[in-house]
Amino acid sequence: MKHFEANFDGLVGPTHNYAGLSFGNVASLNNAALVSNPKAAAKQGLQKAKALADLGMIQGMLAPQERPDLNTLRRIGFSGSDAQVLQQAAKTAPALLNACCSASSMWTANAATVSPSADTRDGKLHFTPANLVDKLHRSIEPTTTGRILTATFNDPHYFHHHNHLPEHNSFGDEGAANHTRLCQEYGHAGVELFVYGQEATNPNAPRPQKYPARQTLEASMAIARLHQLEEDNCVFIQQNPDVIDQGVFHNDVIAVGNQNVLFYHEQAFLNTQAKLDEIRRKLDTELFFIEVPTTKVAINNAVKSYLFNTQIITLPSGEMAIIAPTDCQENPAVYAYLNELLTLNTPIKQVLYFDVKQSMQNGGGPACLRLRVAMNEREVAAANQHTLLNDALFARLNTWVDKHYRDRLSTQDLADPQLVVESRTALDELTQIMKLGSVYPFQR
């Protein structure tokens, strides 16, 4: 049977804006209050996804969340018509309105953690939506995320969906952005790397001082239990607290893995050597640990360019390629390193550059925009076929974006009642295009 790694990218929602909501994410804070272009953002994301499909990859799309989130605004005491709720929130609590209008679900690396059937005791593909408790604007996503995932991977014979973890900082979970999987072939049992920022229940353990550690060891271990993983299939590794304090808010900003390659910055982890030895012990295959030294790429350049927030994909030819943002080309140190990387004797043979600037300005590169799902051909056939990107769906989604999305949106525009109407009309049509059923609160 054939095995693949599919990528499911987040469709950028109609309210994509720059409100600077993500403390600890330098790009997000630096670009707060810029005027955004939701139409361009959605098209950039679709273009990147289609390019991967054209390379022969299995590429899916995940629907965005309903925003503005009037349910949450009502839950915290705003009342009246939709227009009145928006007006009151804009006047008395603009920061809360901004949080309820975020299009952050576009970064599906935070949607969930996924364990493929080759690793799990029951032989099913497991999904757990991330609770994202560290950030208000993302903590309101998981229930709808769970519905969208269930509608996308909709055959219970193959797919096992869990509820998100308890909504408490002890179980802070940021999904696949802090998780990667190493293996020989996608269909073989692999080793899942769970990267955490702190131990919530151990006050003496190392933790960052300036910015929050969004992922806890307790959350990572809970996911491993839920997903029925054996100890031999897991390695728990702590992210270096010093790099979190330099703006590395998720592990996918400082490391990325694919099959038998782990590409990471020398400052990425604590106890690096011991953990690499553990991976070698648990995964009996030839491994390539590509460590990028600080002397070649400083942390600030890695964060600015999102060198590690790239995708490493295995092309149908068997060669690996890096999918990088054009920002990597524009940073001399990073561009020089990537050119050097291609001369080293590793499976990575090419670098392909994509413009995802609308996402980058909010602090998310190519890897943030996708959820990786290792699947066999039966599982691919059992998934919702209307979510898999081909020429027809690509054309249809582009037409849908042209019809419903604005080409400029400022934070002041978020209080416009018309935005609610536009957003709901768009999402209602999208659920019909992608055959998702009633996943949104306004449809229920």
UniProtKB/Swiss-Prot annotation:
Its EC number is 3.5.3.23. The gene is astB. Catalyzes the hydrolysis of N(2)-succinylarginine into N(2)-succinylornithine, ammonia and CO(2). One of its GO terms (molecular function) is N-succinylarginine dihydrolase activity. Keywords: Arginine metabolism, Hydrolase. Belongs to the succinylarginine dihydrolase family. The active site is at E174, H250, C368. InterPro entries: AstB_sf, SuccinylArg_d-Hdrlase_AstB. Gene3D superfamilies: Succinylarginine dihydrolase. Pathway: Amino-acid degradation; L-arginine degradation via AST pathway; L-glutamate and succinate from L-arginine: step 2/5. Pfam families: AstB (PF04996). One of its GO terms (biological process) is arginine catabolic process to succinate. It comes from the Bacteria. Substrate binds at residues 19-28, 110, 137-138, 214, 252, 362. It catalyses: N(2)-succinyl-L-arginine + 2 H2O + 2 H(+) = N(2)-succinyl-L-ornithine + 2 NH4(+) + CO2. This is N-succinylarginine dihydrolase. It comes from Shewanella sp. (strain ANA-3). Homodimer.
